[in-house]
């Protein structure tokens, strides 16, 4: 957004992150504020009150995505749900000039367990994950993904309910990406801090796929640069108001990712799986379908292809020491 000429106020949870972001964007019209705990009901009141005069747009992108949790309520569900509610309440109370809020949701709020097992199913913005907050609380070690999926679903539903029931003075749009690949931020402190989606690339270049390629996951992906573009255009374009956007470039498999990296990084040959290594392919019965036409047309996205995204991701990881 700074590149588009906006004056940006962003929030982080620690002063260490704030310093890294300031250092990474010298000369930008940028203010970095601290919000240590987004699950507090008044988490964003102070920063919105301080900067709300003249504020036009808000993007809420913060929500935990990982499967290493021990308490789904405090680590996933409440930060996602209360974080979303607290942003919207703060805007409503303290920033009457805000025209639109864009919330980062997820394909997790669209998919269903039955749907992803059905190759005849076509997912679009019309679909909602049936998981509830209570389902998320019941998640255990054998189904950790359900807690994350529930957290994104209830958070996005809360955003739409707020606009519908609370007489909001602003418009809403939501962005629903699946797995997000692409170059990592150069202010990332170390490979240990890599996001969940890109962790597969770290494992790949460190030789962890050499003997067997792991299962791919949900088979739909998008490049982080297209996700950023989707947020910017959903914020600015009149036709985006009041809409969900299923933001995906299409299919991927871990086998395709390995092949792209093997093609472009011959110097990593000894760490990469060769063509005979098993695993990481599409299911024999096929994969569910998707409809990304709304995002393509309304947001005007020319999707970055998988091979380019994979190459750019590995380049950025190698710069961090991978």
Predicted regions and their residues:
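NAD(P)H-binding glycine-rich loop region in Rossmannoid oxidoreductase-like domains
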Residues: 13-82, 92
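Active-site Tyr-X1-5-Lys
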Residues: 131-172
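Glycine/proline-rich active-site loop of Rossmann-fold NAD(P)-dependent oxidoreductases
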Residues: 168-169, 182-198, 233-245
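Alpha-helical substrate-binding/gating segment
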Residues: 200-245
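Glycine-rich Rossmann NAD(P)(H)-binding loop
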Residues: 214-217, 245-252, 283, 299
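Conserved C-terminal active-site "lid" loop/helix of NAD(P)H-dependent oxidoreductases
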Residues: 279-300
């Amino acid at each position: 957004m700074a590149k588009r000429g906006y004056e940006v106020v962003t929030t982080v949870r620690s002063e260490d992150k704030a310093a890294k972001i300031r250092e990474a964007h010298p000369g930008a019209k940028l203010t970095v504020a601290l919000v240590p705990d987004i699950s507090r009901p008044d988490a964003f009141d102070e920063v919105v009150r301080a900067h709300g005069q003249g504020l036009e747009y808000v993007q809420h992108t913060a929500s935990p995505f990982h499967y290493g949790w021990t308490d789904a309520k405090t680590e996933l569900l409440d930060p996602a749900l209360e974080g979303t509610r607290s942003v919207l309440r703060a805007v409503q109370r303290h920033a009457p000039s805000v025209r639109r809020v864009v919330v980062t949701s997820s394909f997790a709020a669209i998919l269903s367990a039955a749907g992803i097992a059905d190759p005849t199913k076509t997912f679009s913005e019309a679909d909602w994950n049936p998981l509830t907050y209570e389902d998320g609380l019941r998640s255990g070690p054998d189904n950790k993904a359900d807690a994350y999926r529930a957290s994104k679903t209830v958070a996005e539903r809360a955003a739409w309910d707020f606009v519908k029931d609370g007489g909001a003075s602003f418009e809403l749009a939501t962005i629903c990406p699946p797995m997000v690949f692409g170059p990592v931020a150069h202010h990332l402190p170390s490979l240990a801090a890599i996001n969940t989606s890109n962790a597969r690339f770290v494992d790949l270049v460190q030789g962890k796929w050499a003997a067997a390629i792991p299962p791919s996951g949900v088979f739909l992906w998008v490049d982080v640069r297209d996700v950023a573009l989707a947020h910017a255009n959903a914020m600015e374009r009149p036709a985006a108001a009041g809409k969900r956007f299923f933001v995906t470039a299409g299919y991927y498999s871990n086998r395709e990712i390995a092949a792209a990296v093997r093609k472009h990084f011959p110097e990593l040959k000894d760490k990469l799986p060769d063509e005979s290594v098993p695993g990481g392919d599409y299911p024999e019965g096929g994969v569910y379908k998707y409809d990304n036409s709304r995002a393509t047309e309304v947001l005007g996205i020319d999707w970055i292809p998988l091979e380019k995204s994979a190459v750019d991701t590995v380049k950025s990881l190698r710069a961090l020491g991978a």
